[in-house]
Every structure is written in structure tokens, then in C-alpha cells.
Amino acid sequence: MPAQPHKQAVTDASHLYEVERRARHCERPGFRITEIQLSPTQTVPWHTHTNVSDTFYVLEGEMRLFVQNPKEAIALKPGQSYAVAPGRPHLVTNAGARSMTFLVLQGVGEYDYVPMV
């Protein structure tokens, strides 16, 4: 059964899931760049964004990105990227045995994080 949107969108999702490290490198109206490090057991849970796309760029480790509409599983290694369109549900996992570090470029538009249930 596909994930369904939760009713409450938030503008700061940092308290909703654990990461090893999170650093904001750039934030301007309608655009931001964040570096995130996940341990092998951590995930960024199913969610979507109303207005912004997420472009993932892997720096270290291996990422597994799951998306819906249509359903896909994308494997990314260092130097590879993938863009998720606004409104497309997605989940990020560490596919390796060591920490994985990636950049996420979010924009252009007003940021929100819509958890899925």
C-alpha cells in the first residue's frame, strides 16, 4: 500500500528523524543546500514537498533512494545525483556498511516537509 500524506506539513523537519550530522551550507529565500550524514541504520523517512524539488548528490558512501509515482529504487554512489520533483513521495537510506554523506539542494520555492503515514 503506498504511503499517504500526513495532514501536517512542517517548515523544519530536523526534529522528525535522527542523523549523524546535519549542516546547512546555504539558505536564501526559495533555495537551500544541506549536508547530511547517515549511519548505516538511519533513514530519512517517507515524505514529500509541496513546492520544492530535492536534488541529492552523494559525497561519500552509498545511497538508496526510494520514490513513488512511479515507484522506483535508485542507487547512488559518490559523484552521482538524482532530482525528486515536488509532490513525489521519497525515502532516503544508507545502502552501505559505513556512514553515507550527501548534499540535498532544495528549491526553488517555499520549503515544507510533509511526513507520510
Each language-model region and where it sits:
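A short beta-loop-beta micro-motif enriched in histidine and acidic residues
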Residues: 25-32, 42-57, 69-70
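Short, conserved beta-strand element in jelly-roll/cupin
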Residues: 37-39, 50-65, 105-107
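Short beta-strand His + acidic residue motifs that chelate non-heme Fe in jelly-roll/DSBH
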Residues: 46, 65-66, 84, 90-97
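Short acidic-glycine-tyrosine-enriched beta hairpin
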Residues: 70-86
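A short hydrophobic beta-strand segment most commonly corresponding to one strand
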Residues: 98-113
